[in-house]
């Protein structure tokens, strides 16, 4: 028994048995996690079983597995595939006649990180849609362009909904003293043609004024971009970060007019960074908005223009494979906020 347990899990027999107790020591957990990070499939299976627990340990382990799956935590090159396959096996067990009503399998019958990972591994389309319905409910795309329906949950070209983008960006800056992020808006109201950014800025200025670094997530029709108001040498500046084709002049003018409400006196104080970063990140504008906020929240007092321009230029030097990996991992990291 000792030899078998040690060869499979790199744990002693007492350490292995302790996994079934209410409290698992940090030492045993660290040993198991180390093996998981190295791609040990037996340990991955074991950790996925621990993640089923509906207590602090179960939630901690489930989060750790998702961090490895989403690339937030580094592991062996194929770690995400090993983890989601292990979750898929558990999902199949959870849905057989014996266990389907067992509360111990609750995380595989309701929105959870484990269920999301299982769904990503499912190749059967009808089962994939069934899992997506459990996670999202009956959410459908409003237009052909807004690909937010359940059938597209794991699609590498899926457009994020406003609620998903809001959940991720608000969660991201919850503890950041540097940024204030507003709920995503459209630039122009589709029927009244009102400039919604202008309206939101007027409300902000009337209530509490703008923060030192105030972010607006703006949709120009079928595309998300970042609008940042910040102070530089006691002067209000505005930065637009657009990761697709250059905006048309009408759209730029609408943004410039709105910026005047915040105290921008000259149009040259509105800086447009426009580079197409989306060749290998289809419908990825919202992903870049999320990542931009991540960069800005970690940039401290650095000039945001320099920070974002350097990121964009560096991103364009990445290989196709590296850009595709950014697409996959960022989508997973963003959707995690909708699972909490």
UniProtKB/Swiss-Prot annotation:
<keyword id="KW-0645">Protease</keyword>
<dbReference type="InterPro" id="IPR054328">
    <property type="entry name" value="SseL-like_C"/>
</dbReference>
<keyword id="KW-0843">Virulence</keyword>
<keyword id="KW-0788">Thiol protease</keyword>
<keyword id="KW-1035">Host cytoplasm</keyword>
<dbReference type="GO" id="GO:0030430">
    <property type="term" value="C:host cell cytoplasm"/>
</dbReference>
<protein>
    <recommendedName>
        <fullName>Deubiquitinase SseL</fullName>
        <ecNumber>3.4.22.-</ecNumber>
    </recommendedName>
</protein>
<dbReference type="Pfam" id="PF22103">
    <property type="entry name" value="ElaD_SseL-like_N"/>
</dbReference>
<dbReference type="GO" id="GO:0008234">
    <property type="term" value="F:cysteine-type peptidase activity"/>
</dbReference>
<dbReference type="GO" id="GO:0006508">
    <property type="term" value="P:proteolysis"/>
</dbReference>
<dbReference type="GO" id="GO:0005576">
    <property type="term" value="C:extracellular region"/>
</dbReference>
<comment type="similarity">
    <text>Belongs to the peptidase C79 family.</text>
</comment>
<comment type="function">
    <text>Effector proteins function to alter host cell physiology and promote bacterial survival in host tissues. This protease targets the host cell ubiquitin pathway by acting as a deubiquitinase in infected host cells.</text>
</comment>
<dbReference type="Pfam" id="PF22102">
    <property type="entry name" value="ElaD-SseL-like_C"/>
</dbReference>
<keyword id="KW-0964">Secreted</keyword>
<feature type="active site" description="Nucleophile">
    <location>
        <position position="285"/>
    </location>
</feature>
<feature type="active site">
    <location>
        <position position="223"/>
    </location>
</feature>
<dbReference type="InterPro" id="IPR054329">
    <property type="entry name" value="ElaD/SseL-like_N"/>
</dbReference>
<keyword id="KW-0378">Hydrolase</keyword>
